[in-house]
Amino acid sequence: MQASAKNRSFTQLIEFEIEPRQQSGLVSALSMQTERLAQRYQGLISASVQASDDGRRVLSLLQWQTREAGEAAFRSFESGEQDFWALIRAHQAKTVTFNSFQVLSSIARSHDDALHCNLIS
């Protein structure tokens, strides 16, 4: 049985290119912003903020239950509600790349150490 595209979870990736001295501050700011998103918007499954070893990149990953949930949160960036553009300026990001993906397969380890695979086709 084929799952509807509407039922697939949705992932947003935002990659920042920065100077190494800005990395820890940007990681902290993105972590706080992600916490606010989780409190204000329904449908957040998971989120992470990742930093490159060379200090020049930060990756924000947000996984949502639906595309609509992710897009609602993203609109808050565009409208200035989350002050995303101020965050970019404050940490002097050289480039910011936005990408979005539908999740078609995922593997996760449960609390009992079992692996669970979810394939959506």
Predicted features by range, described:
Residues 17-30:
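Short, surface-exposed ligand-recognition loops at beta-strand->loop->(often short) alpha-helix junctions
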Residues 5, 32, 36-45, 63-99:
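An amphipathic, aromatic/His-enriched active-site/gating alpha helix that lines ligand/cofactor pockets
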Residues 1-8, 48-56, 84-121:
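Glycine-rich beta-strand-turn "strand-cap" elements at beta-sheet edges
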Residues 22-24, 68-70, 106:
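Residue-level signal for secondary-structure boundary sites
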Residues 9-17, 46-78, 113-121:
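Short, well-ordered beta-strand segments in beta-rich or mixed alpha/beta enzyme
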